[in-house]
Amino acid sequence: NAVYWNRRYDPDSIIKDKHIKRQLESININVRTFNASLLNEPWQIATKSGTPFRVFTPFWKAARAQPLTTPLPSIMPSSIFKTDASETLKDWNLTPSNPNWAADWSNYWKPGEVGAQAQLHDFLKFQLDGYGKQRDRPSLQATSRLSAHLRFGEISPLQILTDVTDYVRKKPHLSDAKSKFLSQIGWREFSYHLLYHFP
């Protein structure tokens, strides 16, 4: 028997996860945790003296110098532990109605991995070229709109980095836009680095 989960990096979650791990191991259940939300673990990027970074630019330079793992293909498990029947989300009456204040959300965000993939594809095809000049203009829809997908684990920063790099390899005139966009992924990494080391 084993339980697997993706690591979290804020202090309260680390404490909770360690407690859960101890409880499971006390009843002989193996626990394996993984990094699914960052390019590098917060403890993997350090200054030459071995201390955590406090400034973005040297942090991102050091992070980019790290070797990256190749994203693995999605593999469906051969079997999944069966659970007892439970209520559906529809049973909980969470879908808004009268008024349906969420009616337009589907125009802006398609939840799930498929929606994340489509959003990344559309961003690369239609918006990456102007990203450097347009990203700071709130009146334009010039950002990647991947934040929610990243937050909920529907796409990984490694997949974004890999897909953007592969796309720009075929369109080298976009290399400056690529650097500007990937630096935003870097800022996300840096925020986790700071959260972990300096909560």
Model-derived features with residue positions:
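Trp/Phe/Arg-rich N-terminal binding region typifying the photolyase-homology
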Residues: 1-71
